[in-house]
Amino acid sequence: MKSEKLKRGLLVALVWLLILGLWEGAYRIFEWRCYVFPAPSHVFDSLVNLIGFKTWFGDPVWAVDAAGHSVAFQMNPNWPLHGQPLQLTGSLWNSQLPAAVGTSILRLLLGFSISVVLGLFIGLAMFRFKFIDALLGPVFLGLQTLPSVCWVPLAVLALGINETGILFVTVMGSFFSIAITLRDGLRVTPTIYRSAGLVFGAHGIKFYTQVMLPAGLPALASSLRSGFSFAWRSLMGGELIFVLKQEGVGHLLAVGREFGDVGQVVGVMFIMVLIGMAADRFIFAPLEKKVQSRFGLGG
């Protein structure tokens, strides 16, 4: 089993390396305008610059004559470091990218925690009380489809351009999904759990804390997984527009846009995707799988 997973992982890595190699090779052959669509080397240079180093892998590999044509098999003496040693300018952890990632993760943890608490209580309420479900269910479904950046103007006008505004956008963009997913998951909870709980005297608060909440763990795990993705997208949308003292990953994307650095734009987008994939792969997917396996729901 482990060998199969290793082979699959190596195959995936090989395919991606092939794609990147073809992409870089096409740029070197056709030499399109890199400020319109960057090659992987330009993206690499931009990301390295954001962590305090300086490289020029995107420069021509071959020397260039007076007419601007490449001289085959004659290396460019300035590639890839312009004759300078590779050295860190400043502190690694205080450089732009690590500092921005740390800021965004702290904001995400706070906003996502609030979303989980709100989604948990409102999701349980919609499951328990038909009136609340009829009142809030359709509205929450509609608000769940609303792009998170639509909350930004309201946040700016009501709360100002500050950390509270970004927190508001993050929470409003994610907790509807958590509440709806939890409610729908609780609805398909086997009725035998409820009946057994009532038979053994679980009433009132105990019914929810000792019966429904444990029985609803598969639904809760699924709601956390979907809610995280909504929270991360909402936070990135808010940081893209809000300009604060503490710069997040979304702000680096906005800076790349303002300065026309398409390499930085693509590189920061890659970091956004990488963080989301890592959180899902190493936290939420294993959590959901473990809970489903515990309740005999795993495939």
PLM segments and residue spans:
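Periplasmic/extracellular loop-to-transmembrane helix junction in inner-membrane transport proteins
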Residues: I29-S113
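Generic hydrophobic transmembrane alpha-helix motif, especially the helices
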Residues: G137-S177, D184-G185
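Transmembrane alpha-helices
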Residues: F168, M172, G204-G238, G267, ...
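Short cytosolic juxtamembrane segments of multi-pass membrane proteins
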Residues: A285-G299
